[in-house]
Each structure stands twice: as structure tokens, then as C-alpha cells.
């Protein structure tokens, strides 16, 4: 059986990147929460 995690920088960025987050209302909330918490990295 193959491993379920097959890393790809492109897919990671498209799914969890900054522009993907900002594209939806809830994604914007995610970024806002992480900013408020003081996260060094906001998105993947």
C-alpha cells in the first residue's frame, strides 16, 4: 500500500497558500486568527 502523503509544493500552495485562504470569507478568518495569535507563518 502506498503512503498517503505524497509531497508537492505546488499542490500545498494552491490548497493552503495565502491566496487560497484569502479567496474565502472563512479563510480570511483563519489568517486573521493566526495574525492575532502572533504566528510567524500565516499560511503554507
UniProtKB/Swiss-Prot annotation:
One GO BP annotation of this record: translation
Region Disordered, residue ranges: 24-44
GO cellular component: ribonucleoprotein complex; ribosome
Gene Ontology MF annotations: structural constituent of ribosome
Origin: domain of life: Bacteria
Gene3D superfamilies according to UniProt: 1.10.287.3980
Biased composition (Basic residues): 31-44
Alphabetized UniProt keyword annotations: Ribonucleoprotein, Ribosomal protein
Recorded family membership: Belongs to the bacterial ribosomal protein bL34 family.
Protein name in the entry: Large ribosomal subunit protein bL34
Biological source species: Caulobacter vibrioides (strain NA1000 / CB15N) (Caulobacter crescentus)
Classification lineage: Bacteria, Pseudomonadati, Pseudomonadota, Alphaproteobacteria, Caulobacterales
Amino acid at each position: 500500500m502506498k503512503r498517503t502523503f505524497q509531497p508537492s509544493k505546488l499542490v500545498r500552495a494552491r490548497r493552503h497558500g495565502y491566496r487560497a485562504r484569502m479567496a474565502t470569507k472563512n479563510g480570511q478568518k483563519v489568517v486573521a486568527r493566526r495574525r492575532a495569535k502572533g504566528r510567524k507563518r500565516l499560511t503554507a
